[in-house]
């Protein structure tokens, strides 16, 4: 190559060298980020490894946790979690029909706790009752599969021992999952998929909650009444109260946030809750909520949380909760959710 040709080609060579350097640097940065992402994904899918994790007060005196996600979640909630409600609604069942009593409690544990296991995966929840969530210990794959496995076993058992209860269980699962599906579609597609406004929007949300949460408590009544409908209204209303209580505590309870490991988890996940729907119907708070749902920027989320804490939104939510609990005082006391909420003066 002549010196003249080299001088002409030199700028191009420099540009190529610069491009190669930039590509190499970009590759290294991308590789590092991808590696970190792969590690994070591995934890999500396969967990931290429960053998290396100990939790004081769980799984025995040696602090080792149970060897399966379902047993772990039971250790957090306690076996036969619905026993106080069952004994309150049907005081003689345990004495008269011990096998049916045992089956009903196992069904309710399976439905409630397996749905919690999957819900925590969907929400990327770090904590449950101030302990690490199951999917972070065992991985999302094993946790979800165990939930399906436990539910399948209890369905099969119910169909063999009490076919009427098995049919009620299947019916309830379909309705619960329909409600959960509505909630997930709203979260996936954002506020554009939630096209209701005003009172209609509150009714739309309530319909979802009655499916997702109300059905759980209606199922308990159906199981206790051998498929009878006589407790549907009472326990459906209680289910709506329980959902409202959970939604409000997600925003207004510091104790609840501590136990969950995050404040306003619903808002951070772009998930609709009753306070969010109320705020969307208030012209003073709607812009902050919509901005947070669109951007997921921490600053926007903070401003949206402040909007949810505004007296107009908070008072509406807590008043609705109080009204929903009228006539349910005994059930509320037996269910025993103790986290305190801070009230607007």
From Swiss-Prot:
Organism: Epichloe festucae var. lolii (Neotyphodium lolii)
Gene Ontology MF term list: metal ion binding; prenyltransferase activity
Keyword Transferase: yes
Record GO biological process: alcohol biosynthetic process; isoprenoid biosynthetic process; mycotoxin biosynthetic process
Record's keyword terms, sorted: Glycoprotein, Magnesium, Metal-binding, Transferase
Protein name (Swiss-Prot/TrEMBL): Prenyltransferase ltmC
Binding positions for Mg(2+) 2 per the UniProt entry: 119, 123
Family indicated by similarity: Belongs to the FPP/GGPP synthase family.
Designated gene of the protein: ltmC
Details of cofactor binding: Binds 3 Mg(2+) ions per subunit.
């Amino acid at each position: 190559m002549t010196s003249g040709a080299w001088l002409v080609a030199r700028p191009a060579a420099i540009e190529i060298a610069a491009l190669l350097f930039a590509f190499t640097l970009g590759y290294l940065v991308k590789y590092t980020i991808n590696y970190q992402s792969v590690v994070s994904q591995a934890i999500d899918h396969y967990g931290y490894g429960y053998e290396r994790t100990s939790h004081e007060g769980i799984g025995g005196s040696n602090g080792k946790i149970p060897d399966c996600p379902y047993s772990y979640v039971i250790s957090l909630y306690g076996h036969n979690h619905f026993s106080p409600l069952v004994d309150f609604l049907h005081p003689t069942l345990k004495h008269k029909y011990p096998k049916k009593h045992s089956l009903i409690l196992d069904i309710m544990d399976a439905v409630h706790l397996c749905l919690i296991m999957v819900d925590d995966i969907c929400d990327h929840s770090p904590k449950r009752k101030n302990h690490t969530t199951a999917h972070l210990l065992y991985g999302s794959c094993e946790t979800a599969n165990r939930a399906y496995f436990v539910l399948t076993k209890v369905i099969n058992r119910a169909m063999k021992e009490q076919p009427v209860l098995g049919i009620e269980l299947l019916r309830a699962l379909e309705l619960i999952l329909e409600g959960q599906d509505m909630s997930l579609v709203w979260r996936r597609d954002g506020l554009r998929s939630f096209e209701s406004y005003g009172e209609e929007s509150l009714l739309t949300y309530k319909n979802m909650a009655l499916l997702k949460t109300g059905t759980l408590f209606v199922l308990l009544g159906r199981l206790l009444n051998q498929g009878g409908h006589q407790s549907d209204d009472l326990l459906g209303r209680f289910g709506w109260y329980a959902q409202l209580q959970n939604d409000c505590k997600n925003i207004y309870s510091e104790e609840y946030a501590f136990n969950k490991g995050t404040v306003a988890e619903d808002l951070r996940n772009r998930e609709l809750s009753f306070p969010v729907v109320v705020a969307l119907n208030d012209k003073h708070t709607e812009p902050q909520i919509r901005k947070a749902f669109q951007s997921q920027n921490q600053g926007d989320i903070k401003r949206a949380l402040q909007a949810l804490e505004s007296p107009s939104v908070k008072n509406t939510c807590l008043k609705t909760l109080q009204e929903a609990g009228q006539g349910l005082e005994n059930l509320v006391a037996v269910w025993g959710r103790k986290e305190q909420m801070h009230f607007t003066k």
